A protein has these predicted regions:
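Conserved beta-strand-loop-beta-strand hairpin that lines the nucleotide-binding pocket
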Residues: 72-83, 87, 164-191
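Helix-loop-beta hinge of the Bergerat
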Residues: 105-143
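Amphipathic alpha-helical interaction surfaces in cytosolic regulatory modules
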Residues: 7-90
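Conserved ATP-binding N-box helix of the HATPase_c
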Residues: 52-54, 146-181
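Hydrophobic, Leu/Ile/Phe/Ala-enriched alpha-helical segments that form helix-helix packing faces
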Residues: 23-26, 54-59, 134-141, 156, ...
Length: 191
């Protein structure tokens, strides 16, 4: 029997615990899972990476991939495509609904796409690429001195290494800069 896991309408660090609890309940008795994101209106990198991790964990003992219904809002689908989410999702889910096919991920001053970290050898390459883009984001968007971004690079490297060493499997990393002037009157970066 297929069990439903609703992806929150606003999927970020604040709604992740709700998602994780639903995932835990649905996966407790085994069976195939359906991650329903059709009503999702927004997802942060935190939510997208969390959804990929759940998909990785939800593969059935028989090897069947979990199901994923994609968001119906065109702008959400477009963002998920630009973020690189579907590159990883195609490997993990049986995807239902129309979604952007393989898009070339272009460099952006506000988005570092979802990037797979699969082995210790990957960490240096992944961190090197992401570090270059992160420095551009942190210095241009947040006005941080490029030298001061080394702490960010070290934290990112440690996080990527922890994926490999402690998770016992691969993982993903993504970074997005947000302009929340309405709420905070400043720019922030969410990792």
């Amino acid at each position: 029997m297929t069990k439903l896991v609703d992806v929150p309408t606003q999927f970020d660090d604040r709604s992740f615990d709700q998602f994780a609890a639903a995932f835990g309940r649905a996966s407790a008795d085994g069976g195939r899972l359906l991650f329903d994101a059709h009503a999702t209106e927004w997802a942060s990198p935190y939510g997208l990476v969390g959804l990929l991790a759940a998909g990785q964990a939800a593969r059935s003992p028989a090897g069947e991939p979990p199901l994923l219904t994609v968001p119906t809002a065109p702008e959400v689908l477009s963002y998920w495509g630009r973020s690189g989410f579907f590159r990883g999702a195609r490997e993990l889910f049986e995807i239902h609904g129309k979604f952007p096919r393989a898009q070339a991920v272009t460099d952006s001053d506000v988005l570092l796409p979802v990037t797979a970290v699969r082995a210790a050898e990957d960490v240096h390459d992944v961190v090197g690429h992401i570090q270059q883009r992160a420095i551009a984001i942190l210095s241009s968007e947040l006005g941080i001195d490029p030298k001061a971004t080394m702490g960010f690079a070290m934290a990112l490297s440690e996080a990527c290494q922890n994926i490999v060493e402690h998770a016992g499997t691969g993982g993903w990393v993504a970074v997005q800069s947000y302009h929340w002037r309405r709420r905070l009157a400043r720019r922030v970066v969410v990792i």
